[in-house]
Amino acid sequence: MMGDSVIYYVEQADEPVNRADERARKTFKYFWRELFWERRRIISALDFAMVKVPFFQDGEDGEICEHMWIDDIYFDGLYIYGVLNNEPGELTNVEQGESVCVPVDDISDWMFVCNGIPYGGFTIQAMRGQMTEEERTEHDAAWGIDFGDPGQILLVYEEKEHPENLEEHPMCRNCIDDFRQQLSQNSDYLREQDEDGYTPLHHEAIAGNALMVQAMLEYGANPASTTSEGYTALDFACLTGWQNVADLLEPRH
């Protein structure tokens, strides 16, 4: 897996990497959905999951920026929380192992690895696309991962074999009947709110679990419930880009 030395300093004027940054931000929802379900698994399926974010510090010759990876990720629909995985090269205002919080729109990449297969890694593939074959081999050996064709980036598990996994996570499809059965016996928990005002409906909407959201609504979940900052489940579905979830939560007239 990644070592502390595997840090890449990227010029912000690098157009392929800038495009990769944007793709990572637009598709982050798939990363969080996978991590959401990973936490429900009895046996972990992921080798690791990380998000790359930029860190800044004023230097003698101007601003210094290092793009580094964080893990132990949590996402509340607005902010990403994690722990810095890398040892900074030049920065002195942040340390490896330090807890960090960044707006989701600030990320520059995401990646998870399942059974040795990488998903995401947009900036990695952008940089690999500019390398020679020998350089790519050395790069992949440093990570301990075969990143394959730089032009092919997977977003979800078994995407090629099951493109429907883009729309709904396979674990969601597999457990929805049991979930409905549980709700039919006791749906009281749907009205619970955590210390920040999030309900179960908020969390499922952020993760893009349309089948779960639909079942919750049928069993009395209140789509008008707001977090302490005033966000509804619909707000989060729109912010994260889950249109199929937003369609379920739109008020009916």
From Swiss-Prot:
ANK repeats lie at residues 196-225, 229-252. InterPro entries: Ankyrin_rpt (IPR002110), Ankyrin_rpt-contain_sf (IPR036770), DUF2314 (IPR018756). Disulfide bonds: none annotated. Keywords: ANK repeat, Repeat. The keyword Hydrolase does not apply. This is Putative ankyrin repeat protein NMB1133/NMB1171. It comes from Neisseria meningitidis serogroup B (strain ATCC BAA-335 / MC58).
